[in-house]
């Protein structure tokens, strides 16, 4: 299936002569021309080994990526930080909890904008 990417953010990194350097980076990561021609869908997780609520997110992201591929998109997985209240509470770490939510939102937005992804699947613990 051929997609019209002319109005999608990923057009800046996938269409035309100006995006040749960008496409070379995608090819270096193993993407084929067919993958680059599809919408790019960011799959963001807060996977880490800090708490049980995040430990399975890497596996869940693999399932989400399969779903994106089956729906005709090209998944691009990335992670962000997390501060788990269950561990951060009751000591100085509790000051990091609320601030971490802004950092998470900012880092996901910056990745989406910086890499011109067209859509997002977000997974958090």
What do the PLM-derived regions correspond to, one by one?
Residues 1-125:
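Metallocofactor- and cofactor-centric catalytic cores in central/energy metabolism, strongly enriched
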């Amino acid at each position: 299936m051929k997609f019209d990417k002319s109005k999608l953010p990923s057009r800046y990194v996938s269409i035309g002569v100006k995006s040749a350097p960008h496409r070379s980076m995608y090819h270096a990561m193993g993407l084929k021309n067919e993958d680059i021609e599809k919408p790019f869908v960011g799959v963001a997780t807060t996977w880490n080994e800090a708490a049980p609520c995040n430990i399975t997110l890497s596996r869940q992201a693999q399932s989400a990526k399969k779903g994106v591929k089956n729906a005709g998109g090209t998944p691009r997985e990335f992670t962000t930080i997390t501060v788990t209240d269950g561990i951060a509470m009751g000591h100085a770490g509790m000051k990091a909890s609320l601030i971490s939510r802004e950092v998470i939102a900012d880092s996901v937005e910056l990745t989406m904008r910086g890499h011109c992804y067209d859509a997002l699947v977000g997974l958090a613990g």
